[in-house]
């Protein structure tokens, strides 16, 4: 049961102590059946990776075991750590890693598509002081990153390299669930940028909580303002994934996920069309546009700029105005017909591939 919000939050953490505790080999894992004492050490199976654990300095207040392990992992003789990190950075920026099995760099892993590039990025990463900001800046400023998903010789290149292993164009991909939710909050002007604090509980339909014996205590929605925070602060439970996030391939927290599934299923379209969260974002954006822009055409023009960060082309603006007038006629008997019609336009725009996909 979730504690009251006024209760201080505590977290468990490991602490290092100077006095080393003897570690025994346990027979059949039974703590009451201790065998000989096992000394700490590195991987003895591989000779060049096996190093003794040194004793700490006399004035040290810790055993230095965890520090030596950290130094061992990040040592320049260890070729894996830096490569694993830059491969994950590349995967998040480009949509696909140089090694497509980010959790497995062993003998059964996929071979790197560009081994020289992986080695070079890893060396630049280490020489740059293991700075993720530097390596991210380097990648996003490259010609490879700035490519379009379309190519003037698209048909010819597709026949030669249909999987784009040679990176002759950008891999178009849909936004992750968290990025999509945050983007919707951003364009509607609803995003709460508060940092830190406890996680928030979003509102859920009663049907989602049917499996709980105590529905009221199992899930208490946070205040509306807190529910507009970034998705990184959203509560994540193993036994209950938020339906909207799950529809867009939000992974389960029951096991590590190095590479998310990217599905295209009907539940995603239904969520974007019918979910109350989506309709609220459309309505709030329309409300802001009406307040800031008096003319209908100006409001629709700025809706395009707000959602796509570009001005609409003449035929796009014409189609949007046509849809707006059609919806306004449909809602003519309602007092807020203009708001409803403009909300419909915004709803159509955020359902477009241009908004949902990173090109």
Language-model features and meaning:
Residues 345:
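Globin-like tetrapyrrole-binding proteins
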């Amino acid at each position: 049961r979730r504690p009251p919000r006024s209760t201080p939050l505590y977290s468990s953490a490991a602490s290092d102590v100077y006095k080393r505790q003897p570690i025994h080999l346990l027979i059949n894992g039974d703590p009451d059946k201790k065998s000989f004492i096992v000394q700490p050490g590195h991987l003895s199976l591989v000779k060049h990776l096996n190093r003794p654990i040194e004793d700490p300095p006399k004035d040290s207040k810790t055993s230095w075991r965890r520090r030596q392990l950290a130094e061992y992992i990040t040592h320049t003789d260890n070729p894996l750590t830096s490569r694993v990190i830059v491969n994950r950075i590349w995967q998040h920026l480009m949509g696909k890693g140089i090694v497509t099995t980010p959790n497995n760099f062993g003998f059964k892993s996929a071979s790197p598509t560009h081994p020289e590039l992986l080695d070079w990025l890893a060396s630049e990463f280490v020489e740059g002081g293991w700075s993720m900001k530097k390596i991210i800046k380097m990648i996003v400023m490259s010609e490879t990153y700035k490519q379009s998903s379309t190519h003037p010789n698209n048909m010819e290149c597709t026949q030669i390299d249909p999987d784009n292993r040679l990176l002759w164009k950008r891999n178009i991909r849909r936004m992750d669930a968290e990025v999509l939710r945050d983007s919707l909050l951003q364009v509607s002007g609803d995003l709460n940028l508060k940092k830190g604090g406890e996680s928030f509980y979003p509102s859920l339909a009663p049907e989602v909580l049917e499996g709980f014996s105590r529905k009221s205590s199992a899930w208490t929605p946070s205040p509306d303002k807190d529910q507009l925070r970034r998705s990184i602060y959203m509560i994540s439970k193993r036994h209950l994934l938020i339906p909207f996030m799950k529809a867009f391939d939000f992974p389960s927290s029951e096991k590590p996920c190095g590479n998310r599934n990217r599905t295209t299923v009907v539940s995603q379209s239904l969520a974007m069309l019918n979910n109350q969260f989506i309709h609220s974002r459309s309505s709030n954006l329309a409300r802001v546009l009406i307040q800031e822009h008096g003319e209908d055409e100006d409001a629709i023009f700025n809706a395009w700029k707000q959602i796509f960060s570009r001005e609409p082309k003449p035929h796009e603006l014409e189609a949007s105005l046509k849809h707006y007038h059609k919806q306004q006629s449909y809602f003519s008997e309602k007092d807020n017909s203009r708001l409803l019609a403009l909300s419909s336009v915004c709803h159509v725009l955020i359902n477009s591939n241009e908004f949902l996909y990173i090109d």
